A protein has these predicted regions:
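A short, conserved beta-to-alpha structural element at the edge of catalytic cores
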Residues: 154-174
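Hydrophobic alpha-helical segments at protein termini of multi-pass membrane proteins
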Residues: 4-7, 30
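Structural signal for short hydrophobic segments within the conserved structured cores
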Residues: 192-196
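Cofactor-binding active-site loop characterized by glycine-rich and histidine/acidic residues
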Residues: 18-154, 172-178, 182-190
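N-terminal glycine-rich anion-binding loops that anchor highly charged ligand groups
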Residues: 8-22
């Protein structure tokens, strides 16, 4: 994939979020500022049969996966023309038709859902994989370890992607998590892991 094909969606995410925050009715949002490449890189590796689930920081992943900007804006502003009829907002934005199986506002709430989607794909013998993006704050949640255990045990087509921005809401990572490298959390489950910067 050429660099411009990756740069364009990153610029779209940045411009979209900046335009959103200029609106007086933008509400509470979690932005992707400086992290646009994470969503774009993940989505560049996904195929049409693959599913993406994100944390509550959903705008970048939704746009990168192909949800139309006008539809995302409508959802964020509570309009009925949004993919969830304006009821999901940022924290529960979804559009499965384009492979964006949704966001979850609860820290780590998307992890077990992703395992369920991967299990359904396996049972139904559907092609594709599930990519689940979560923040480093979810690394201390039991749901991560439960989802990783099930994924490893049942050999589910599930890729865990930790977007480590160093903060769990307002707690610095070093005060909340013991591992120096969060990718080491995969070791007990004998899952391949890598730290990418």
């Amino acid at each position: 994939m050429d660099a411009l094909a990756l740069l364009r969606p990153m610029m779209l995410i940045r411009a979209f979020e900046e335009a959103l925050m200029r609106r007086p009715d933008h509400g509470f949002q979690l932005l992707s500022s400086g992290e646009e490449a994470i969503a774009v890189g993940i989505c560049a590796a996904l195929g049409p049969d693959d599913a993406l689930l994100s944390s509550g920081r959903s705008i970048g992943p939704a746009l990168a996966r192909g949800v139309e900007p006008a539809a995302v804006m409508a959802e964020l502003l509570g309009r009925t023309t949004g993919p969830c009829g304006g009821k999901g907002g940022r924290g529960h934005l979804a559009q499965p038709a384009v492979g964006f199986f949704g966001a979850h506002a609860v820290v780590g709430g998307n992890l077990t859902i992703a395992a369920g989607v991967a299990l359904a794909m396996t049972i139904e013998q559907r092609p594709g994989i599930v990519a689940c993006v979560f923040g480093d704050g979810a690394c201390g949640a039991g749901a991560l370890h439960e989802a990783m255990n099930v994924a490893a045990l049942w050999k589910l087509p599930l890729v865990f992607v930790c977007d480590n921005n160093g903060w769990s809401v307002s707690t610095p990572r070093a005060a909340a998590l013991a591992p120096a490298r969060l990718s080491d959390l995969a070791a007990p489950f004998r899952m391949p892991a890598a730290t990418v910067d």
